[in-house]
Amino acid sequence: MHLRHLFSLRLRGSLLLGSLLVASSFSTQAAEEMLRKAVGKGAYEMAYSQQENALWLATSQSRKLDKGGVVYRLDPVTLEVTQAIHNDLKPFGATINNTTQTLWFGNTVNSAVTAIDAKTGEVKGRLVLDDRKRTEEVRPLQPRELVADDATNTVYISGIGKDSVIWVVDGENIKLKTAIQNTGKMSTGLALDSKGKRLYTTNADGELITIDTADNKILSRKKLLDDGKEHFFINISLDTARQRAFITDSKAAEVLVVDTRNGNILAKVAAPESLAVLFNPARNEAYVTHRQAGKVSVIDAKSYKVVKTFDTPTHPNSLALSADGKTLYVSVKQKSTKQQEATQPDDVIRIAL
């Protein structure tokens, strides 16, 4: 065999081996970056506990076959189910008080909230927030978002309807302290600045409402955009250090960044219509789910640009972060309609940031 031919064969072999190693490296990196596991039907919000080293997922299960729902406790690394907490009421919204290690779940269709001991999985109590019977004329308000103030052991819950409220619940006794009235049409978004004693809510009227948690009074309300277009500011997440709010809009292809001191818009980030949003102070980033687009965006909170996009089909829903800000969790729903439920369970995705 000629020396030149032998060299050519060796070169081609080296190039092929190199390309295989590179492809394998990229494949391994992608696998390490994102882990996806099927968990259960009707997946909604999540809560993370560093103390318990666990992630909880609220699932409503089948609309037709299951009367209640299940809260799954997951290993935050492998996403394997380590406990299934069955409930007679369906859980949707979720939060945790990290001081008392109490999980709170909103039972939307029953206008109630359930408290669960994070360590044992035992139900600590339940509170019906709107006991009116549903009729053609009466629509009881429904719990949507929940936030817990660890410092005061208070839970704030947005009760949505044509004219929404925010319920203020005593976490120790699981009793209603008061209801903050007149928070607008479908005031779904809810975020708390515990140190600043401020609670923020957003609604389908296009408003940002600021509440003083010292007396539970509305301090201000501002229509964020006056452009003649329809807006539904569905969720909000805070950067309390820089007094900014990241606000998603399910009706417009942009995420707003707002100065919480005055309601002025700092930036409009181009992105598909959005659902959940979560700010990560450890990385100065915000994460956003785009339900219809089937994607999750990473927004650089310095440049206000989308710097990365994860494909998360079919419908990415809610977000949670590990305590160190190095891991993002996404609940992902399968395609489903009122006529045809999803046949497969919904998923949770773990993303290494």
Curated annotation (Swiss-Prot):
InterPro entries: Haem_d1_sf, Host-pathogen_enzymatic-act, WD40/YVTN_repeat-like_dom_sf, YNCE-like_beta-prop. Disulfide bonds: none annotated. Pfam families: YNCE. SUPFAM superfamilies: C-terminal (heme d1) domain of cytochrome cd1-nitrite reductase. Keywords: Signal. Residues 1-30 form the signal peptide. PANTHER family: DIHYDRO-HEME D1 DEHYDROGENASE, PROTEIN NIRF. This is Uncharacterized protein YncE. It comes from Escherichia coli O157:H7.
